[in-house]
Amino acid sequence: MDYSEIMVRHGELSTKGKNRMRFINKLKNNIQDVLAPFPAIAVRSDRDRTHVSLNGTDYQPIVEALKLVFGVQALSPVYKLEKSVPLLVTAVQDIMTSLYRDGLTFKIATKRSDHAFELDSRELNSLLGGAVFEVLPNIQAQMKHPDVTLKVEIRDEAAYISYEEIKGAGGLPVGTSGKGMLMLSGGIDSPVAGYLALKRGLDIEVVHFASPPYTSPGALAKAQDLTRRLTRFGGNIQFIEVPFTEIQEEIKNKAPEAYLMTLTRRFMMRITDAIREQRKGLVIVNGESLGQVASQTLESMQAINAVTSTPIIRPVVTMDKLEIIEMAQAIDTFDISIQPFEDCCTIFAPDRPKTNPKLGNAEKYEERFDIDGLVQRAVSGIVVTEITPEIVNDEVENLIDALL
């Protein structure tokens, strides 16, 4: 027998009361986005399950994709069949025969939500267990911790049989907690911050600053590939490329070297906030980790934050670098992040950046710039690309070859 579908059990959605169906419908849409590379599948949801019909598609890549989607508590490959006792008996016998090995223990666990069905749960357990013994007389039944728990569900529309339960990613469906702008540089930290924001249901749009010719097409492709990795957790992501060359050259030419990083980050924050307002976001997300670099001391954060009243979420702020690296490896962004392309934060980095910049000094140096004009020109020049979870090469070099 081949699996008919993957049955998805919802996570925290069971606690969402009157908003439950909104959360479930969002999860359904996210699953459809993530499974877009598999055109034969079909997705439908009810109040306590989402059903992914395979329609002949190999179940294994579908399971691997669904395991990453936030809002999924658990999933099971299942056999779907008509609610017929003879069909159930045959299916259970075939499944257990295919699984059998010497010493195998099992139990039947039946759940009947269709109370009009001819047998109740206890009667079905007895009947189906007996059917297994007919074809496997040496198998052993065991009620506690058996090797195989064969789950049989009798629902209104059909009967379902499964024996695997695979842990999902948990969290909330992406998009159920509002929208935020993720400042993604291309380093290790910001993709991890984006992943953690996605886990709590935040719909992120990626803001990436590009300064050609100082930053290369490879750096842009790298940032887009990192964004593509993040789409596996909740579907399509809007990638916003911001032209930043003019601003960086202005800062380089007119500001003291010690304040280059502070002023650069203040402009980035202003621009991200303007894009957030334009695109109806609620928060800004970044990958700052307290004390990790000069721009991430409390004094630096205070001086940079002063340009906006928008909430700033820093998911990795208390994490050690090694913890961030481990998470980046777990979510498969690390190998991309360490590709050797310079980003806007590194091309003009001073040898001795100010670790305790004074807000008054930053504001004084900014009097040398046409702040509103620079920000407006940057925002008006953005390029928005929708990044989808299509199948791509693992290596950034292959992406660069396609650009050349």
UniProtKB/Swiss-Prot annotation:
One Gene Ontology term from the biological process aspect of the record: thiazole biosynthetic process
Protein location: Cytoplasm
One cellular component term from this protein's GO annotations in UniProt: cytosol
Role description: Catalyzes the ATP-dependent transfer of a sulfur to tRNA to produce 4-thiouridine in position 8 of tRNAs, which functions as a near-UV photosensor. Also catalyzes the transfer of sulfur to the sulfur carrier protein ThiS, forming ThiS-thiocarboxylate. This is a step in the synthesis of thiazole, in the thiamine biosynthesis pathway. The sulfur is donated as persulfide by IscS.
Pfam families documented for this protein: ThiI (PF02568), ThiI_fer (PF22025), THUMP (PF02926)
UniProt: ATP binding residues: M183, L184, H208, F209, R265, G287, Q296
SMART domains recorded: THUMP
Protein name: Probable tRNA sulfurtransferase
Pathway: Cofactor biosynthesis; thiamine diphosphate biosynthesis
Record-listed E.C. numbers: 2.8.1.4
Statement: the UniProt record of this protein carries the keyword Manganese: no
THUMP domain sequence ranges: 60-165
Catalysed reaction, written as an equation: [ThiI sulfur-carrier protein]-S-sulfanyl-L-cysteine + a uridine in tRNA + 2 reduced [2Fe-2S]-[ferredoxin] + ATP + H(+) = [ThiI sulfur-carrier protein]-L-cysteine + a 4-thiouridine in tRNA + 2 oxidized [2Fe-2S]-[ferredoxin] + AMP + diphosphate; [ThiS sulfur-carrier protein]-C-terminal Gly-Gly-AMP + S-sulfanyl-L-cysteinyl-[cysteine desulfurase] + AH2 = [ThiS sulfur-carrier protein]-C-terminal-Gly-aminoethanethioate + L-cysteinyl-[cysteine desulfurase] + A + AMP + 2 H(+)
UniProt-listed Gene3D superfamilies: 3.30.2130.30, HUPs
UniProt entry keywords in alphabetical sequence: ATP-binding, Cytoplasm, Nucleotide-binding, RNA-binding, Thiamine biosynthesis, Transferase, tRNA-binding
